[in-house]
From Swiss-Prot:
GO terms for cellular component: nucleus. Transcription factor that specifically represses the expression of the gene cluster involved in the biosynthesis of beauvericin (BEA), a non-ribosomal cyclic hexadepsipeptide that shows antibiotic, antifungal, insecticidal, and cancer cell antiproliferative and antihaptotactic activity. Keywords: DNA-binding, Metal-binding, Nucleus, Transcription, Transcription regulation, Zinc. Residues 19-46 bind DNA. Residues 87-143 are annotated as: Disordered. GO terms for molecular function: DNA-binding transcription factor activity, RNA polymerase II-specific; transcription cis-regulatory region binding; zinc ion binding. Disruption phenotype: Leads to elevated expression of BEA1, BEA2 and BEA3. This is Beauvericin cluster-specific repressor BEA4. It comes from Gibberella fujikuroi (strain CBS 195.34 / IMI 58289 / NRRL A-6831).
Length: 633
């Protein structure tokens, strides 16, 4: 070929348009309508010629807020997503491609998920089935992980249309994960599922139920990515924006889903005023995955920011949970005894969330009435262990109610500033005491399941007796808090377990210290590698907070002082091992609260007894004073 012909030859311009099928095959697309000829030739449906764009959360926020139903009772989710969006700075994502239309402004944002064309559905399905496979934790070596990353690199080069990304009619198998998404999803199944449950095996609902549901729920999929990213990048300041992006995306998706729920107004009896009727908005369709998504976002809010409590999510989820109960006819005791595994998982997760949150804010005792139906004093014939509540979900209902009464009692102390405050305080205290007496009887009446009736979970590290021991600990923790706040109850002579053998001198002090010692001695017998270590934190905090005061060396070298010091050491070591295994900020807050409680108790004059020390320095008060509120679950 002559030089002149080379110069005359028209320069080929690389096409950046066309359907994604032709792009993947790296061939030129003729862009015919309704579909290109090459797709017709190979016998696939042409996906069309959408221009690739990058999604901006700020525009998504405006769309959500402009929804005709955005002003409903779930506006807290919209504001939460908006606040997170405002914290984010624009940052380009190397795994996405910018639009080539320079006449329009380029839209720049993270876009955690991308969707493949319809011709690549089988590839996406095969990839996700491999990723979601029920495999034990930490079984992927570095070579396998590298292969997993290589498999999705080619898919990152071809982002797809935005309207397909947020199409909830499409199942998860329509999505092709980016490299980053694949790493985060792998981290969920290899690490988060392992430490976020009291047991881990193929029976772990975080593996079995969640993976099954999120295959058809982009919302749940986004929430899983949010919590996994929060743990994966924990403490990595250079990558702190990544989990924030996934959290914002999940909250925006949640806001959008809530705004589309069908509702109707109904008149119901007010829980606080039995003679009054109130108009309430009833949700007509609440799915399991929607409830779990909100629970996951609320429970893991502190993974993103240790000071986050997740309470805005809790307040919104209660209405959804009540509607979910009604839709599933769970007010019928026979229906409750025949709940599916998914329903048991949802109920236990909601109850655990309520228990962990009840120490963080003041609420009316009647606000937890919707949980009472799940406190059947007679366990079913075969108990299915739950990731967070173990084998005794009712115990955590009792704990939630107990901590609510404790906070109510603490709030009464502020009435002294009023001239007639003491009169009102005594009247209100009498009401709380009556509720505390009734609650104590419920706790003592509840029968823990026998070891033989606990379903095998297939985890050699977490045996059924570990789960049963945790249930005993939390039952005693609830009683400890109840007796500490309402000492009059101790005169009834009730005892939670025959294993507790106490003197009858100072009823309150001996009973509380005896309960604390019993809790910690039970926890000592549970090995450090037990999966239950993930749900021990609040019991350690409650029992550890009454270990004192310890007089200075030389004043009292008796067995009580030595035992108190020994148990304090155990609490420190167990919490440190818990942090080493889980590596989440809220664990550090719990240890800081205990150290402050112990320091203040030990500074009391020697003439003051343990009773006054426990009353003066309750861990909830210290938590509030030091601004250490967080989710301890």
């Amino acid at each position: 070929m002559t030089d002149e012909s080379k110069r005359c030859r028209t320069k080929k311009v690389k096409a950046r348009t066309g359907c994604s099928t032709c792009k993947r095959r790296k061939v030129k697309c003729d862009e015919q309508l309704p579909g290109c000829k090459r797709c017709a030739k190979i016998g696939v449906e042409c996906p069309g010629y959408h221009k690739p764009v990058k999604w901006s959360v700020k525009y998504e926020r405006h769309l959500v807020n402009s929804s005709p139903t955005a002003g409903n009772s779930f506006s807290c989710f919209d504001s939460g997503a908006g606040n997170l969006s405002n914290l984010m700075q624009p940052k380009s994502n190397p795994g996405s491609v910018e639009t080539q239309n320079h006449n329009d402004n380029e839209v720049q944002a993270p876009g955690p998920l991308t969707r493949g064309s319809s011709s690549s559905l089988s590839d996406a399905r095969e990839h996700l089935e491999d990723t979601l496979e029920m495999q034990p934790p930490s079984t992927l070596n570095s070579e396998q992980l590298s292969t997993l990353c290589d498999d999705v690199q080619a898919d990152e080069e071809f982002p797809c249309a935005l309207n397909a990304l947020h199409d909830d009619s499409l199942c998860l198998t329509s999505y092709i994960p980016t490299l980053q998404t694949s790493l985060i999803l792998d981290h969920y199944f290899t690490t988060v599922c392992h430490f976020n449950s009291s047991f881990d095996s193929a029976n772990n609902p975080f593996r079995s139920e969640v993976s099954r549901m999120m295959a058809d729920s982009p919302l749940l999929f986004g929430c899983v990515l949010s919590m996994s990213a929060a743990h994966l990048y924990q403490g990595d300041k250079s990558s702190s924006c990544i989990p924030l992006e996934f959290q914002t995306e999940a909250m925006s998706h949640l806001s959008r889903t809530l705004s589309e729920l069908p509702t109707r107004n109904e008149c119901e009896v007010d829980d606080n005023r039995p003679m009054a009727l109130v108009s309430r908005e009833k949700i007509l369709n609440v799915s399991d995955d929607l409830l779990l998504s909100i629970i996951f976002l609320g429970m893991t809010a502190a993974w993103h920011d240790v000071s986050a409590t997740g309470l805005p999510h809790l307040h919104g989820s209660r209405q959804l949970f009540r509607s979910w109960i009604s839709l599933n006819n769970l007010t019928d005791i026979e229906k409750r005894r025949k709940m599916t595994r998914t329903q048991i998982f949802v109920v236990s997760s909601m109850v655990y969330w309520e228990a962990m949150s009840s120490a963080l804010f003041d609420q009316q005792y009647e606000g937890l009435s919707h949980l009472t139906m799940f406190c059947d004093p007679h366990p079913p014939a075969l108990v299915q262990p739950c990731p967070w509540t173990g084998v005794a979900t009712p115990i955590f209902v009792f704990l939630a109610k107990t901590l609510t009464l404790v906070r109510n009692n603490q709030a009464l102390k502020s009435l002294w500033v009023f001239e007639s405050g003491e009169i009102h305080r005594r009247a209100l205290y009498g009401e709380l005491l009556a509720k505390a007496n009734s609650l104590e009887r419920e706790i003592l009446r509840y029968r823990l399941p026998s070891l033989a009736l606990i379903e095998d979970i297939g985890d050699p590290c977490t045996t059924p007796d570990h789960l049963l021991a945790i249930s005993r600990c939390y039952r005693m923790a609830a009683l400890l808090e109840l007796y500490s706040a309402f000492p009059e109850i101790t005169r009834t002579g009730g005892r939670p377990d025959s294993a507790i053998d106490l003197d009858r001198g100072d009823e309150k002090t001996h009973l509380i210290m005896g309960l604390a010692f019993s809790i910690l001695e039970i926890l000592e017998k549970i090995p450090d590698d037990s999966g239950t270590i993930s749900i021990q934190l609040l019991s350690l905090l409650i029992a550890g907070s009454v270990l004192g005061p310890v007089p200075p060396r030389g004043e009292d070298e008796g067995p009580k002082r030595l035992e108190t010091l020994r148990l304090r050491t155990f609490v420190r070591q167990r919490i440190h091992k818990m942090y080493a295994a889980v590596r989440l900020g809220p664990i550090g807050n719990a240890m800081a609260i205990l150290e402050e409680v112990w320091a203040r108790m030990d500074m009391l004059p020697a003439i003051q007894n343990a009773n006054s020390a426990i009353s003066s320095f309750h861990w909830i008060n210290i938590m509030s004073q030091k601004k250490l509120e967080t989710m301890f679950g």
